[in-house]
């Protein structure tokens, strides 16, 4: 079974400008690797399809390093053998993702089969509805 976390599903004209993601995983397994997918308008496949959660936010290989760059970062990690809490962000200020009719922002297969996981998200977008 594949889990999908939908961060935003909006109608009308607009632009995605960024998101934050927080995870509270009560497992000793890596919580990431869910592909990020941005669906725009009437596409049959994602307009943006990434390779993994950590890649989208600017790090790799299950890193617990804290960093904060102008457009992406992992600003908090608390890691014990059976529990991880992490917060990250990415801003599309120079590469917004425009849509005319609707847009959907998702991460797929997050923590698939790993037990209890809590997620917190926020998505920033500009609405162009007239």
Language model region names:
Residues 1-130:
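Beta-strand-centric surfaces of beta-sandwich/beta-rich domains
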